């Protein structure tokens, strides 16, 4: 579901949540949320905004500070062409203050003079961001070992993005999707979703009713041509196909196939 800004505004006014969580680009629906409108209205209401950008980092523009996004997490495995297993995260001072209000240093690594915060302890080390942030604090606490291979992967992904340039990467993904959509439309297929909210790196197409759930076509594309496209999930399962144009796959040679 794509939320209009006034829908979020009404819900925030009615329920007064402390926290709103959104997915920037939802690959299951191929739609993107209008964060540039939603973020500022949540900031005005004093609501924290968290956004999952796993499917859009490196493929679509999103401006964390300008759009008033308080916390953002992502992944390497989509538009950055990296392996799964590492999640880039950014938070602002508002979120850092909330996180540190629950800071408790575990006994095994607790330095002399450490003072715990008043908030409840975080039950999982994996999600204890207050302790993770101490990696860069003067204490340099280390409560678990990072996967070094993933840090190398993240560094390489960043190098690739910087070498191409962010705007050039966005343009490449956008051009590839536009080309795919023009070709599909020329074939007589119907695109899914509202044009203004479509992602720049995933395209949805209605499966022609004559083809049923479309699985035979998907299998034939994979077996005969080495091309794999997806179906969807939930209410859209068997109703649309999804074609991803992300990262290294998003190249002219692949699009023209």
Located regions from the model:
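Conserved active-site segment immediately N-terminal to the catalytic lysine
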Residues: 65-77
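Conserved PLP-binding catalytic core of the aspartate aminotransferase-like
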Residues: 190-224
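Active-site C-terminal subdomain of aminotransferase-like
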Residues: 77-182, 186
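Active-site cofactor/substrate anionic-group-binding motifs, chiefly glycine-
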Residues: 1-3, 228-232
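Active-site phosphate-binding strand-loop segment of PLP-dependent enzymes
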Residues: 2-54, 71, 79
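Hydrophobic beta-strand scaffold residues
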Residues: 49-50, 191, 229
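PLP-dependent enzyme catalytic core of the Aspartate aminotransferase-like
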Residues: 235, 239-257
């Amino acid at each position: 579901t794509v939320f209009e800004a006034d829908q979020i505004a009404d819900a925030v006014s009615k329920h007064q949540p402390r926290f709103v969580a959104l997915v920037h680009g939802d690959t299951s629906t191929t739609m993107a949320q209008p964060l540039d409108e939603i973020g500022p209205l949540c900031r005005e209401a004093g609501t924290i905004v968290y956004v999952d950008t796993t499917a859009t980092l490196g493929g679509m523009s999103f401006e964390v500070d300008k759009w008033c996004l308080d916390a953002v997490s992502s992944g390497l495995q989509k538009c950055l062409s990296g392996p799964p297993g590492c999640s880039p995260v950014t938070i602002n001072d508002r979120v850092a203050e909330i996180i540190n209000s629950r800071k408790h240093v575990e006994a095994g690594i607790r330095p002399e003079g450490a003072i715990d915060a008043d908030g409840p302890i975080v039950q999982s080390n994996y999600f204890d961001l207050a302790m993770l942030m101490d990696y860069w604090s003067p204490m340099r606490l280390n409560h678990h070992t990072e996967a070094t291979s993933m840090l190398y992967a993240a560094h390489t992904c960043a190098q690739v993005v910087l070498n191409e340039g962010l705007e050039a990467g966005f343009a490449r993904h956008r051009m590839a999707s536009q080309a795919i959509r023009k070709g599909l439309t020329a074939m007589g297929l119907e695109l899914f979703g509202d044009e203004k909210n479509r992602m720049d790196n995933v395209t949805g197409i209605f499966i022609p009713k004559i083809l049923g759930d479309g699985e035979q076509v998907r299998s034939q594309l994979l077996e005969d041509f080495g091309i794999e496209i997806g179906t969807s999930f939930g209410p859209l399962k068997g109703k649309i196909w999804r074609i991803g144009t992300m990262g290294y796959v998003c190249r002219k040679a692949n699009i023209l196939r």
